[in-house]
A protein has these predicted regions:
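Formylglycine-dependent sulfatase
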Residues: 1-281
Length: 281
């Protein structure tokens, strides 16, 4: 690829973006993992200015960004843009709890799932940080609870407890909604993104879409049509699947006639996953 001439994973669509656009080859981060990177992207601030000095939040952590903090979404919304978040949030939001005595306490342990009231709205959500539309899940795909939240409400009932083990495909045990299929999350989020872009174009609205993917983070779950495509391992298959969907999204911008008036930024929030077995890549 453009960034690694010795890399074995085929990423033609990302390579095309890089060749046609601007690439950043001297980037630095104060913490190369999910939560602090997302915090920096949305706020323009160093992660160590938050209470979280290192590491990441869990799926039940409280909101890291205070509601009065300016984000790129709130800035663009103020300037007339429609704004949307679709994907993996991993910046915390506040679940409603059955017992208010637990409401202001750290919620990181397994027992907290019994205390969450999934019938009520979340608070301190992406909607309160400048996003007109917000759809996604709370943390990484290996962090419960496994539910989609759309504009502060879960989209389906939590009826299952799921867990999976394995080198590539593992996720932690936790509550799972009946519309949440781990393997289909990445394509589902891209489908939602394509629908949003089409809707905004039809309405003639300028828009900002923040699409933070859960992939290729663990669990590494390429869909059936991508399994074995790389000839390397499941992680490489997963990256190829992402590349394909990025290409499809860019093609949609072309078909709608808005690609010349749209800035597309693709970046990573992590280095390569240890589960990727990167020595073969």
């Amino acid at each position: 690829g453009v960034f690694n001439k010795e890399g074995k994973i085929q990423t033609p669509h990302l390579d095309h973006m890089a060749r046609q656009g601007m690439i950043f080859t001297d980037a630095h981060t104060s913490s190369a993992v999910c939560t602090p990177t997302r915090y920096g992207i949305l706020t323009g601030r160093y992660n160590w200015r938050t209470p979280l000095k290192r590491g990441v939040l869990s799926g039940t952590s409280q909101a890291l960004i205070p509601p009065n903090r300016t984000t790129v979404a709130s800035f663009l919304k103020y300037n007339g843009y429609q704004t949307a978040f679709i994907g993996k949030w991993h910046l915390g939001w506040d679940w409603a709890l059955k017992d208010s005595a637990f409401q202001n306490k750290p919620v990181r342990n397994q027992e907290i799932f019994d205390k969450i009231d999934f019938t009520k709205k979340i608070t301190n959500s992406p909607n309160g940080l400048g996003f007109d539309y917000a759809y996604g899940h709370c943390g990484s795909l290996d962090m419960p609870p496994y539910v989609y939240v759309e504009n502060e409400k879960i989209t389906a009932q939590v009826e299952n407890i799921t867990e999976r083990k394995g080198d590539y495909h593992w996720w932690r045990k936790g509550p799972t909604a009946n519309d949440f299929d781990h393997e289909r999350v990445t394509p589902h989020l891209f489908d939602k993104a394509e629908a949003y872009v089409s809707e905004m174009n039809e309405k003639g609205k300028p828009f900002f879409l923040y699409l933070p993917l859960p992939s290729p983070h663990t669990p590494i779950l390429p869909t059936e049509e991508w399994k074995g495509k790389s000839g390397l391992n499941p992680y490489a298959d997963f990256v190829m699947q992402i590349d394909h969907r990025v290409g499809r999204l860019n093609k949609l911008l072309d078909e709608l006639g808005i690609s010349d008036n749209t800035i597309v930024i693709f970046t990573s929030d992590n280095g390569c996953s240890p589960e990727a077995k990167f020595e073969v890549l």
